[in-house]
């Protein structure tokens, strides 16, 4: 099957690996379990991805590509950054719908060297693009120039991901888990209003 449809085989491996990594982390994930879930010989995993670490890196790389595409479709280029700013509530919904990816980020933070993040160059370019968008918005007078652009981007990331990374605190404060549709709606509305207040 792998030779007839390698892309389908890769897709099954990646889907199984996402479940395994998000549940058990990088160290706890087992190649045998991933292969069994994907219904492939584990040799195919090594053939396509080289190693368990290579598989983890590929999952993050593909997810980053998806988010980069979403950024550009929302207008994520200098001079058209208003669309990205307005997409903040949409990001809350997207994060809530993709809890496994958020768990991957948490496992990465717990198990890897923060000085050497996975796919660092690609991800750094992604956040540099977001920071450039903020600066363009500041030049256009839509975001106050007094704010550091990099801190603005980091704060947006924390505001969106925070409830998913700390679900127990979210539940204690609001009485809702962060994937609850009611919480997602309230959070998206709150962040949209907050951003509008901060913008000039």
Question: Language-model features: where?
Answer:
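Hydrophobic alpha-helical connector segments
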Residues: 69-103, 149-156
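C-terminal peripheral helix-coil segments that are non-catalytic and often amphipathic
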Residues: 93, 97, 127-140, 158-200
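N-terminal intrinsically disordered/low-complexity leader segments
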Residues: 1-8
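Helix-turn-helix
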Residues: 12, 16, 20-54, 58-59
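Amphipathic alpha-helical packing segments from all-alpha helical-bundle domains
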Residues: 65-73, 114-140, 151, 185
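Amphipathic alpha-helical segments used for helix-helix packing
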Residues: 56, 96-117, 166-174
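Conserved hydrophobic residue
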Residues: 26-27, 114, 143
């Amino acid at each position: 099957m792998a030779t007839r449809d390698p892309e389908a085989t890769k897709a099954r491996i990646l889907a199984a690996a996402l479940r395994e990594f998000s549940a058990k982390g990088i160290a706890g994930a087992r190649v045998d379990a991933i292969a069994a879930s994907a219904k492939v010989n584990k040799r195919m995993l090594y053939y396509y991805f080289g190693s368990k670490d290579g598989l983890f890196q590929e999952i993050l790389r593909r997810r980053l590509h998806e988010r980069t595409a979403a950024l550009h479709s929302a207008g994520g280029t200098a001079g058209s950054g208003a669309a990205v700013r307005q997409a903040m509530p949409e990001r809350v919904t997207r994060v809530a719908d993709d809890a496994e990816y958020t768990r991957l980020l948490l496992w990465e933070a717990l198990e890897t060297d923060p000085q050497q993040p996975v796919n660092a160059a690609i991800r750094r370019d992604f956040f540099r693009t977001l920071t450039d968008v903020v600066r363009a918005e500041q030049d256009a007078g839509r975001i106050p120039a007094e704010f550091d652009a990099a801190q603005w981007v980091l704060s947006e990331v924390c505001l969106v991901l925070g409830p998913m990374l700390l679900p127990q605190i979210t539940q204690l404060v609001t009485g809702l888990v962060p994937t609850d549709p009611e919480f997602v709606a309230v959070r998206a509305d709150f962040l949209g209003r907050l951003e509008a207040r901060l913008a000039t």
